[in-house]
A protein has these predicted regions:
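A structural motif shared across PLP-dependent enzymes of the aminotransferase-like
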Residues: 63, 85-89, 168
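A short, polar/charged loop-to-alpha-helix boundary motif
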Residues: 75-90
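Short beta->alpha transition motifs characteristic of CBS
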Residues: 67-76
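Short loop/turn motifs at secondary-structure junctions and domain boundaries
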Residues: 49-53
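Zinc-dependent deaminase
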Residues: 1-48, 116, 122-194
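Short beta-strand scaffold segments in enzyme catalytic cores
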Residues: 57-63
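Immediate flanking context of iron-sulfur cluster ligation sites
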Residues: 104-114
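Glycine/small-residue-rich phosphate/adenosyl-binding loop
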Residues: 70-71, 87-104
Length: 194
């Protein structure tokens, strides 16, 4: 099992330094790509996660006015191991803890640098976030592209929401996936060996 996980995602096409340079020099064009600003921020957060030894996934929660009301990144290994600290979970935990009187999330949008895994997708469906946009698909670990495989009740609950890929250029899609690939195989092996 550990051998399979060591090559599941493969190496990123760029080094960590090249990815940092790409993030820092990236210029947005929101006229052509309306999700690019928040998509880029989710990638910057994902890179922070990698620098701390976590999976490279970052998330931004935005209200109906386009204001950022939450942001965070994967914290699975650092500051200490917590199996529930996926990027989406971190953002939703903090938001829900600090906004207990909000009864509807229908007008909110969550941006994530990588397509949500099964656990995060179930959480986002339960939360009722109106729209969840991912920068990069994850055909190996993502669940959005497999929503028809969810149990029927989850499909019914998810029908009130949208889960599209973010409107961003392919350059940002590749950047998001390369950030994730920086340490994904290594960290998956750590999980297998727990």
């Amino acid at each position: 099992m550990a051998r399979i996980l060591q090559t599941l995602y493969g190496l990123p096409s760029r080094s960590a330094q090249e990815l940092a340079d790409a993030i820092n020099s990236y210029q947005t064009n929101v006229e052509d790509y309306p999700d690019e600003e928040f998509g880029l921020l989710s990638c910057r957060l994902a890179y922070q996660a990698v620098q701390l030894g976590n999976f490279g996934i970052g998330c931004v929660l935005v209200d109906s006015s386009g204001d950022i009301v939450g942001q965070g990144f994967n914290e699975l290994f650092n500051p200490y191991f917590r199996s529930d600290r996926h990027g989406e979970m971190v953002v939703m935990d903090t938001f829900e803890e600090n906004n207990k009187s909000i009864t509807s999330m229908a007008d909110y949008t969550l941006y994530t640098s990588l397509e949500s895994c099964p656990m995060c997708l179930a959480r986002l469906i339960t939360s009722g976030v109106g729209t969840v946009k991912y920068v990069s698909p994850d055909l190996t670990g993502g669940m959005v592209h497999l929503m028809t495989n969810l149990p029927k009740i989850w499909q019914i609950l998810a029908a009130r929401q949208k889960f599209p890929q973010a409107s961003v250029p392919s350059l940002l899609v590749q950047l998001a996936f390369d950030i994730f690939k920086l340490n994904a195989d290594e960290l998956n092996s750590k999980i297998v060996n727990r």
